[in-house]
Curated annotation (Swiss-Prot):
Name listed for the protein in its UniProt record: Glutamyl-tRNA(Gln) amidotransferase subunit B, mitochondrial
GO molecular function: ATP binding; glutaminyl-tRNA synthase (glutamine-hydrolyzing) activity
Species assigned in the record: Clavispora lusitaniae (strain ATCC 42720)
Note in the entry: This protein may be expected to contain an N-terminal transit peptide but none has been predicted.
Gene responsible for this protein: PET112
Gene3D superfamilies in the record: 1.10.10.410
Amino acid sequence: MEEKSQVQLDSHIFNTTSSSSQYYPLNVMISRSIKGWRPEPGYPFKCGIEIHTQLKTKHKLFSLSKNSPGAAPNTCASYFDFGLPGTIPKLNPEALLLALRAAVALKSDISSISSFDRKHYFYMDQPLGYQITQHYQPLAKNGHLSLVPRLDDVEEAKTIHVEQIQLEQDTAKLNYNAYDGTVDIDHNRANVPLIEMVTKPDFSHLSELRAFVKKYISLMTHLGVCSGDMENGALRCDVNVSVAGGNRVEIKNLGSTSEIIAAAKYEYARQVQLLKHGKTPVEQETRSWDGTKTIRTRSKEDAIDYRYFPDVELPRIRLHPSIGKDLSQTLPELPEQLIQQLCEEPFLLEVKHARFLVENPDLYNYYKNLHHIIVDKHKLSYKVVNNWIIHEFIGAFNKLDIPVDVSVIDTEKLASLIIMVSEKKISITSAKLLLTQILQSPEDRELSIPDLIDAYDLGAVNDIHGDDLKEAIKEVCSEVIDSHPDVVTKIRNGKTKSINFLIGRAMKETQGKVDSKEFEKMFKKLIG
């Protein structure tokens, strides 16, 4: 199942679609939620993962065809991609560089010599009759990615070891037509460059598996290695699950984080049931995921003999021993480092908010610029910037159900609005309304904040001061109290949140020109 495409903040952050399934007489319900999940005593969970990552190159791995995922079918395919006789592969150096960047980021040992091999099988998605991969001498080995409780939502620190990283070509895409039973083959994906990253079976909890996948995707996207678009197949995963040291079961072609977690959780429960109640042991086999349960596709006895042998048309890759060290010096700061920085002074963001900004580079840069203007130049509190970006700015886009677009209002203009609120030239309520109007109206984006305030008559009350202002506020509050005695009774009986209703009515009466805090103080004084 696909994850929700739009990420909401605060209490809705990183919500995923949930589902459940039933298996065997025990009626075990499997949901995508892992809150409170624990392996059963005596049945330890053991898991490894293989992630196939499409590289974000201009051209394909062994041809000059464009690597364009959104193109019309079969418009980005050369003679070699179609598997025509007489065509010769030539390695794309850009793909090699991106694969090396990924290997360095995962702290892997780069092989000084690596080579390509042919993996033979016959299927519609492989026009050559074999896949070019790296079976005998992969590009990199012995890497790792560390998970920490504060940043990765795991219970304890854990290092996940990467067994190897290999460079290989993707297959063609099969599109099944349920109406007439035909299959269309799109060769645009054939020969698209991939890296296959294989971990050791180090996962002992589903939270570790989820954290690793999210962190890996964030890392590859941040480095420009991959688009990170799982929905369109930029990353595809296979997981290997075993229980209590028994045979492992591979679940192939999982296309989202929620699918990975649901499939692994279901498969663990299935194996535990077999061990508890079955007369036969868990078989070593390959299974697929149908959205509710895993389905057997082939057993160990049915395993394909791929007849690997070296590809004589491609020379070995020979790299200088210092290539890993040299490349590491060219990498930007990694997501974990940036998140850590945003959680410390002078920013002091929550981890979930810092991660959201880092995973959206345009928004990250926007926040840093706004922070510089508001905090460094105008000496306002960091809390002001954090609240405006996380709750007001992103929140306004979410309320309108439109993607966040930082180009709608530049940082100088948003800073101007924030500063005018701090100087009490406009109330916070009016400022929110004005921001929403700017997002909705392209014409208003051309005007300055002061001009917009004048145009919509949103300026704070400036012609009444001191005791006169207090008296005016008291009069409005008294009228609201008289009009809503039932709400006042609720407040006096302990339902203090009901005061927000009264504040809202008062704000409406004054068209948002008076600060809501002033009304709150007065209501509390009058109600007692």
